[in-house]
Amino acid sequence: MIKTLSLLISCFILAIAAGLSQAQEAPPASLAAPEAAAKATPADGHVIHVTAPHLIDGKVRGPFHHYCKIVSPEPFIECLLYETEDNNAKLIGVEYIVAKTVTRDEKVLPRKAWKKVWHDHSVEGVIGNVKVLDMPPDKAKEFADTVAKTDGIIFSLWPEGAKLPTGKVSIGTMVGHAVHQ
């Protein structure tokens, strides 16, 4: 009887210890879905939502969801690119949108480099592939008019169909962009 009771107590203690061990190994819920940070971060402010297809490695892909923020008034805009608008969508690229007064300055960016990897957003707007979402029409037009005075460069970080990034970064461009000679 004492042996049976000792065995039951031992099993009970082992079960509790195993449960505590598992609980300690599981990531805290606060890491999986952190509360809003009190301190502002560089990731804050990507709230301008735009969709547009891209030409990546010779293939039309998308449309991609761009979540953009205006970093400085020249303008300098950065966009985080996703395949979907799901809140758990993976980041698949980045687009930098920069005023033509900066990108067309030979002292800042050699013309040969601009011609190869940058695209003109005034052309992209005319083609009609870009849609500004989640804002009133007058604000969407104001944003589109601002972007029309810029050039863009797209870094595609996640190859199509890959389960993980491979380390290969492709330079995407707008659909309809021709590499200038």
PLM-predicted stretches and their roles:
Residues L8-A17:
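Bacterial N-terminal signal peptides
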Residues S21-A23:
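Boundary at the C-terminal end of the N-terminal hydrophobic targeting segment
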Residues A17-G19, I77:
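Generic detector of short, well-ordered, non-transmembrane alpha-helical segments enriched
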Residues M1-I9:
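Bacterial N-terminal signal peptides that target proteins for export
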Residues E25-Q181:
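Primary mode marks residue(s) on the alpha4-beta5-alpha5 output face of response regulator receiver
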